[in-house]
Amino acid sequence: DYMARSAVKWLLRLGVNVLTMSPGKKDYGHHNYPLERIEKAIAWLRSHGNAKIGIAGASTTGTLALTAASIFSDISLTIAMTPSDFVWQGFMQGRKDGCKEWPIEGESLFSYGGKPLPYMPFCYKHPDYWRMIAEESKRTGNMIASRKLFDDSEAVHAITGEEFIKVENICGRLFLVGAEDDALWNTAKYIRRIERRLAEKPHSCEVEAVVYEHGTHFVFPEGMLKTMLPVGSALFVRLAFSAAKKYPRECKAARIDIDHRMTCVICD
């Protein structure tokens, strides 16, 4: 995965040893991803002299980072960009009946101990799931717009306690970042729910949560984005998301601020 490898390069420049997950061949979906892989990665890093263990992710892997950190106490730094605060239904990507993505019945984003974690099901089934995303993307002028999918699904199925991520179990430091104008899901609402949950429950982690008015789904550190796209990174974001086209300066300012904040968190 090119974006993941680029993120690794950015982290390596900060002097951090990095392992990264890899998508399956011809399967870029997320469904019943075994958290044992994270568990084994932690053990491998420990056995090779790494005293501090952190996890970072963006988008669906931002949710993965939160979920893993809530289960594995060896993780002492968690960075989640545009996460959700709950686990949702697993999905596949590819080509099926003219659709590029579809939900998988009975499967969660993640599994542990051979069992899918409890998840919020999508209210749209195949092929309506992708048709709705495609229609919303065209209507809003975004590369992809699935926010309505998540809003409608939560309206139909109130998220249960088991489906929410137990963020109060996260150890060490927790850094959350998102933007109000995220076109994929309402990460700003989810981040604020995490803050409320932590305010209501005993926890040991030190949390820093930042939500920008403008930043799109690509709330990457500016240096990381430029590593991914050395030429034309800002143009790519503007082409991908209508909010970046309307507010390019604000989005870039957010990425620069994220770069500073995240670098400080990692190097502390």
Task: Write out the residue ranges for each language-model feature.
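Catalytic nucleophile-loop/oxyanion-hole region of alpha/beta-hydrolase
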Residues: 22-54
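Short beta-strand immediately N-terminal to the catalytic nucleophile in serine-hydrolase-like folds
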Residues: 55-58, 81, 177
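Short beta-strand/loop motif that positions the catalytic acidic residue
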Residues: 170, 176-178
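Acidic catalytic loop of the alpha/beta-hydrolase fold
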Residues: 181-185, 216-218
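C-terminal catalytic histidine-bearing segment of alpha/beta-hydrolase fold enzymes
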Residues: 192, 196, 200-268
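Accessory cap/linker subdomain of secreted extracellular hydrolases
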Residues: 79-167
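Short glycine-enriched nucleophile-adjacent loop
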Residues: 62-73, 78
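Short amphipathic alpha-helix adjacent to the substrate-entry channel of hydrolases
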Residues: 3-21
